[in-house]
């Protein structure tokens, strides 16, 4: 039976570049984990693909899934729901495959309460001025929404202490490499591998007895 995979939870403030860094991580063949596509009720942006970037659903559809207990986590952010479908995550982890979640901070804290042995990585901007420039440059939000996102970012950065690692996104390729190193190191933690070696000793003792 395969060992259960790692749940990798990757989040940070809106506009910090989570999606761009995630795409960089998955653009190379050396990653060994699956990406769990999040679900949202926000409008689909130009270039985004349903089922690849997000599962785009109506508010009514999303709320029905919540009532049915089909979401690992969910949060409402700037008037839209974001969340993670539960079935895909459990099925993949049970196969021994790592699952990479790119989710909002609220959702990450929900996951931590349910899966405390996950790997929680917070992506942070070099500073708030650069974060604001990125939000403005994206050209998808009004000045009022951008102001809301900046205030929310301040609150979320204060929650960084709830995470295991903080990675600064000063350059996309470097940030992606840092995240991959964190994940690789997690596979060698003693508390994650001790069971394997304990069983190895027991099996050897049985053969010798």
Curated annotation (Swiss-Prot):
Function: Essential for recycling GMP and indirectly, cGMP.
Signal peptide range: none
Keyword Heme: no
Localization per record: Cytoplasm
SMART domains linked: GuKc
Main location (coarse class): cytoplasm
Reaction(s) catalysed by this chain's protein: GMP + ATP = GDP + ADP
EC number: 2.7.4.8
InterPro entries hit by this protein: GK/Ca_channel_bsu, Guanylate_kin-like_dom, Guanylate_kinase, Guanylate_kinase_CS, P-loop_NTPase
Entry-linked SUPFAM superfamilies: P-loop containing nucleoside triphosphate hydrolases
NCBIfam families: guanyl_kin (TIGR03263)
Domain Guanylate kinase-like stretches: 5-184
Keywords tagged on the record: ATP-binding, Cytoplasm, Kinase, Nucleotide-binding, Transferase
Regions annotated as coiled coil: none
Family under the similarity heading: Belongs to the guanylate kinase family.
Organism, scientific name: Streptococcus agalactiae serotype V (strain ATCC BAA-611 / 2603 V/R)
Single GO cellular component term: cytosol
MF (Gene Ontology): ATP binding; guanylate kinase activity
UniProt protein name: Guanylate kinase
List of residues binding ATP: 12-19
């Amino acid at each position: 039976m395969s060992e259960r995979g790692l749940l990798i939870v990757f989040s940070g403030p809106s506009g910090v570049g989570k999606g761009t860094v995630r795409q960089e991580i998955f653009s190379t063949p050396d990653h060994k984990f699956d990406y769990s596509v999040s679900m949202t009720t926000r409008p689909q942006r130009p270039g985004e693909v349903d089922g690849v970037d997000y599962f785009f659903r109506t508010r009514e559809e999303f709320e029905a899934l919540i009532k049915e207990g089909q979401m690992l986590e969910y949060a409402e952010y700037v008037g839209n729901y974001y969340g993670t479908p539960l079935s895909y995550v459990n099925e993949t982890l049970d196969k021994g495959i790592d699952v990479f979640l790119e989710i909002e901070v609220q959702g990450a804290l929900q996951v931590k309460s349910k899966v405390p042995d996950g790997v929680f990585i917070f992506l942070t901007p070099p500073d708030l001025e650069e974060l604001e420039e990125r939000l403005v440059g994206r050209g998808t939000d009004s000045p009022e929404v951008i102001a809301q996102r900046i205030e929310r970012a301040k609150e979320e950065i204060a929650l960084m202490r709830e995470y295991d690692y903080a990675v600064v996104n000063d350059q996309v390729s470097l940030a992606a490499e840092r995240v991959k190193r964190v994940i690789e190191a997690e596979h060698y933690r003693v508390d994650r591998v001790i069971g394997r070696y304990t069983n190895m000793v027991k099996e050897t003792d049985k053969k010798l007895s």
